Amino acid sequence: MSDTEQLRQAVQAAIADNSFCTLATSSAANRPHVVGVLYAAVDGILYVSASDASIKARNIAQNPRVAVCIPVWQQHGLPPLCVQFQGTAEVCALHDPRMVALLQTGKLDAITGHGALDIPGSCLLRIAPGRRVATYGVGVPLDELMRDPLHADRSVVLS
C-alpha cells in the first residue's frame, strides 16, 4: 500500500472514529464564528445537531463554506494531532428525507440521543469535506513526530 493510501485511510479513520470538532463558519457579512460541536460521521459526511436560530446554522444558511478541525490525539510534550479541512455545509430540516433515513437507521444516535431534536427549531447540519484534507501528525510515525514536529503536516485527496 502506498504512503498516500495509508494516509488517506488514516484520515478517513480519524474522521470516523472521533466525535468532536471545531466548526468555523462565516456570515454573509464575513463575520467569522467558531464553535466546538459533537458530530456523527456517516460515509465521510459530518452531521451536527443544532438550533436553526444558532449562529452556526444562520451563518451556514447565508454562506455554506465552512472549515473543520478535528483533534485526534495528544501525547504529552507534543501538539495535538488533528485533521482539518474546508468544506460545504447545509442546514437540513428534520423532515428532509435524507435526514429521516439516517435517523431511522440510528446512524445519528450519537448526536441525537440526548433529546436535542425534541427542542423546537432543531435541525441538522450536513458538512461535506472538500477534496483535500490537511493533517498534523496523522500518519506520521511517533519517532519522526518527536524528532521533527515542525514537519509533521501532510495533506491528502480523499477521492
Feature-to-residue mapping (PLM):
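Helix-adjacent hinge/juxtasegments
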Residues: 55-92
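Short helix-to-loop capping/linker segments positioned immediately adjacent to catalytic or ligand/cofactor-binding
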Residues: 23-27, 74, 110-118
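Short beta-strand segments
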Residues: 18-52, 68-72, 81-84
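Charged, gly/pro-rich active-site loop segments
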Residues: 2, 79-159
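Short, basic/aromatic recognition patches
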Residues: 2-22
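Short, solvent-exposed aromatic-acidic interface loops
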Residues: 51-55, 105-106
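Short, surface-exposed beta-edge/turn micro-motifs
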Residues: 18-20, 36, 63-65, 121-124, ...
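A generic structural signal for nonpolar/aromatic side chains embedded in well-ordered alpha-helices
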Residues: 14-15, 60, 103, 127
